[in-house]
Swiss-Prot record:
Reactions catalysed: L-methionyl-tRNA(fMet) + (6R)-10-formyltetrahydrofolate = N-formyl-L-methionyl-tRNA(fMet) + (6S)-5,6,7,8-tetrahydrofolate + H(+)
Binding site for (6S)-5,6,7,8-tetrahydrofolate: 111-114
UniProt protein name: Methionyl-tRNA formyltransferase
Keyword terms of this UniProt record: Protein biosynthesis, Transferase
Highest taxon listed in the record's lineage: Bacteria
Principal EC category: transferase
Organism: Rhodopseudomonas palustris (strain TIE-1)
Amino acid sequence: MPLRLVFMGTPEFAVPTLLALAAHGHDIAAVYTREPKPAGRGMKLQETPVALAAHRLQAPVLTPKTLRTDEALANFRAHEADAAVVVAYGMILPQAILDAPELGCYNLHGSLLPRWRGAAPLNRAIMAGDAETGVMVMKMDAGLDTGDVAMAERIAITDAMTVTDVHDQLARLGADLMVRAMAALERGGLQLTKQSEDGVTYAAKIDKAEAKIDFAKPAWAVLRHIHGLSPFPGAWCELPIEGQPVRIKVLRCAIADGRGEPGEVIDDHLTIACGDGAIRVSQLQRAGKQPMTAEEFLRGTPIAKGVRVG
């Protein structure tokens, strides 16, 4: 029989999993997500992507500020769920919540654990130059992404991929993986494996202060830094435009031939020298403007060879 599930998630990454579980006949007893936040020009309250998806499913939506009260625990238990599925919820579950569903709580995590436990695994895998990443379903325990692993899928990370590309691919893969995991749980055949104690790394939350591009680094590291932060918060540099430094977010680039002083524009196509090698910018964004190709940008704002990027 299909499982009765509580789903807990917040961003767009979690939506495919919620929809897939519902499409496969599981009973979504309740959807927990974060509270609406003001956004946009009018700063109107906007519900999370998961809340909007839950409304389409006509599933009850709950946005508790905390799960650490007796009332929150009683409300959670009242759903009488067989299991909970957690995907980027954004709130730590206390042990009492983890213990509430008869079959446990299962998390979809966007890395190949134990590498990149924590808040920003997709970004950190790209920025570190990893050749691959993936998604894993684990049975949650009280630790930070330390639970026993049930299933995993891997993907290659190419130099052309931004965090958006990785995000979208893993969100789709993860939805299928969780459906398979819940089917195995339903049959009583979900196999769990303890995580290795070797190779543990932590994916710290992205800080806007680390977004500035350091062209003294090798070209591959500059590229991965840019792609690991695209589109948000966006890796940035300053270009001299009409005698003034203007902050530009670089959204996409490629490794290019050529050498020069780090930060030097070495041709007419916005190729910028790095500590070793060079990158060619292919997509960028000025403050308050829509993203554009480098070609579109250069038509309106020529950048001469020899200019230094800050």
